[in-house]
Regions:
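Short, acidic loop-to-helix structural element flanking the phosphoryl-transfer center
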Residues: 77-104, 110-114
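Short alpha-helical
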Residues: 17, 46-49, 111-112
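Conserved hydrophobic/aromatic "anchor" residues
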Residues: 5-7, 71, 100, 126
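Hydrophobic packing residues within well-ordered alpha-helices of enzyme cores
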Residues: 22, 51, 89, 113-117, ...
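Conserved H-loop
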Residues: 32, 61, 122-127
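A metal-dependent, Asp-based hydrolase signature
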Residues: 41, 45-77, 94-95
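Conserved ABC ATPase "signature" region
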Residues: 73, 118-121
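Active-site neighborhood of HAD-like aspartate-dependent phosphohydrolases
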Residues: 1-41
């Protein structure tokens, strides 16, 4: 039995980096930036859905691919610029890790997830990351 956590919004506050990556991708495609609150309301269903919502392009439309690629590349390079642990998250992980196996389940790309976990000192707490 594992205690399973989500990452964004549960263990880390990644909103600022996601907003910045979204608006960077929009600007690269000649679109206007969106307010932070609008972008954060689009978060939670993966990068493809986020960029579809932000651009107004269907998830299945090939025209979404350039914006998605720009977002993913930018976010991968900047995923830890402003991302921080949620208040109390590290203390909770320390306490639980002493007694229970922990796992992480996220729709964030694996390489980016690993970078965030390592940068914030969280990777060692998890026996499984998916």
């Amino acid at each position: 039995m594992f205690v399973v956590f989500d990452l964004d919004g549960t263990l880390v506050d990644s909103r600022a980096d996601i907003v910045r990556a979204t608006n960077f991708a929009l600007a690269a495609g000649g679109r206007a930036p969106l307010p932070d609150q609008v972008v954060t309301s689009y978060v939670g269903d993966g990068a493809r859905t986020l960029m579809a919502r932000a651009t107004g392009i269907s998830e299945s439309d090939p025209d979404l691919e350039p914006a998605l690629r720009v977002f993913l590349d930018y976010y991968s390079a900047h995923a830890t610029d402003q991302t921080r642990p949620m208040t109390g998250a590290l203390a909770l992980l320390v306490t639980l890790h002493r007694r229970l196996p922990l796992a992480l389940c996220t729709n964030k790309p694996r390489r980016t997830t690993e970078r965030v976990l390592r940068a914030l000192g969280m990777r060692a707490f998890f026996q499984a990351v998916s």
